[in-house]
Regions:
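Short, well-ordered beta-strand elements
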Residues: 23-36, 54-58, 157-164
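Short helix-initiation/N-cap motifs at beta->coil->alpha
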Residues: 35, 56-68, 187-201
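Short, polar/charged alpha-helical segment
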Residues: 35-54, 70, 177-180
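An extracytoplasmic/periplasmic, membrane-proximal ligand-sensing/linker region
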Residues: 36, 169-184, 253-303
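Ligand-binding "clamshell"
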Residues: 89-118, 205-207, 219-233
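A conserved helix-loop-strand patch within extracytoplasmic ligand-binding domains
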Residues: 101-161, 264-268
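A bilobed periplasmic-binding-protein/Venus flytrap-type ligand-binding module shared by bacterial periplasmic
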Residues: 127-137, 239-252
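Ligand-binding pocket segment of bilobal, Venus flytrap-like solute-binding proteins
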Residues: 156-230
Length: 303
């Protein structure tokens, strides 16, 4: 009889455990097809799991597919960039006067689609022009894009090369707009179009005078590249922040409080270091995320 009771109690506890596991709220996170998105999704997933959520991550998504999946309720949470939402999803071409204005605008526009922008991070993964280390030493006076343009004009006969990824070089709001804003006159002899990853290789090997980069890319520090100030404010702001479906936030309002301190921990330099651990040191995104959460303990919120 005692054995029967023990078995029944054991079965009851087991079923209770299954029930508790089944009761964990599910959050479906999406990530686009580049390192930073994978790292952010992994950090968020591990953090939410530690706070009682069941999390599934779908990675390798294109921008349009990821957005469509979230708008149609197939994904619950994405780390999004204000400039992407403004231009690509909401088709607003006018430049906002500040990062805060950009955030406020996309928060308003996306709310109409049932999407809520939570507290933004402290990093912006926007475009920039950078110099290789040797060029930076040879031209210490070049700290801004305007100063770069002065050198390119003064030394036009030397046909200095500028590396750009193919997409940026051919977009109307890319190279053409940059040249118009800064009064640049880069011809075919000056431009080298290539895959975005090869731009960093060309810069590292000092094969070009300057190149287009992303401000939170881990290779900036690893390759000792010098970022130039966008002194005429051409490049739009791409502040990152978690965007969640309103229906999910209404069901689990503690998510806003839970994700706020995570966003506070993420600035430009932190993201460069995290991205470098994957792209340069070849660590897995999951191990990078786990190490980050160990080094930056965040408070728990019971769902």
């Amino acid at each position: 009889m005692k054995k029967v009771i023990a078995l029944l109690l054991g079965a009851g506890l087991l079923l209770s455990g299954f029930a508790q596991a089944a009761e964990k709220p599910l959050i479906r996170i999406g990530a686009r097809v580049f390192t930073e998105q994978t790292v952010l999704a992994e950090i968020t997933a591990q953090y939410l799991r530690a706070n009682g959520f069941d999390v599934r991550v779908t990675g390798g998504l294109g921008s349009s597919l990821a957005r469509q999946a979230q708008e149609t309720g197939q994904l619950d949470l994405m780390w999004e960039y204000t400039g992407v939402s403004l231009v690509s999803y909401n088709h607003i071409d006018e430049r906002m006067p500040s990062p805060e204005a950009t955030y406020a605008k996309v928060k308003e526009l996306d709310a109409r689609k049932g999407l809520v922008w939570l507290k933004p991070s402290k990093f912006s993964n926007t475009y920039a022009l950078a110099l290789p280390s040797e060029i930076a030493r040879e031209y210490p006076q070049v700290n801004t894009i305007s100063q770069l343009n002065e050198v390119l004009k003064a030394e036009q006969s030397r046909k200095h090369l500028v590396a750009l990824d193919t997409e940026f070089a051919n977009r109307p709001d890319g190279l053409d707009g940059l040249q118009a804003r800064y009064g640049m006159h880069l011809g075919r002899a000056n431009i080298r179009q290539m895959d975005a990853g090869l731009v960093y290789t060309a810069l590292r090997n000092n094969q070009v005078f300057a190149g287009l980069v992303y401000t939170t890319d881990g290779r900036l520090n690893a390759f000792k590249l010098k970022l130039l100030e966008d002194d005429k404010h051409y490049f739009p702001d791409y502040t990152a922040g978690p965007v969640i479906r309103k229906a999910v936030l209404d069901a689990h309002p503690q998510l806003a409080e839970l994700l706020a301190p995570l966003a506070d921990q993420l600035d430009d330099e932190t993201m460069r270091q995290l991205n470098a651990k994957v792209d340069v040191q070849h660590q897995s995104p999951s191990s990078v995320a786990a190490a980050f959460l160990r080094e930056h303990p965040l408070h728990e919120v019971t769902p």
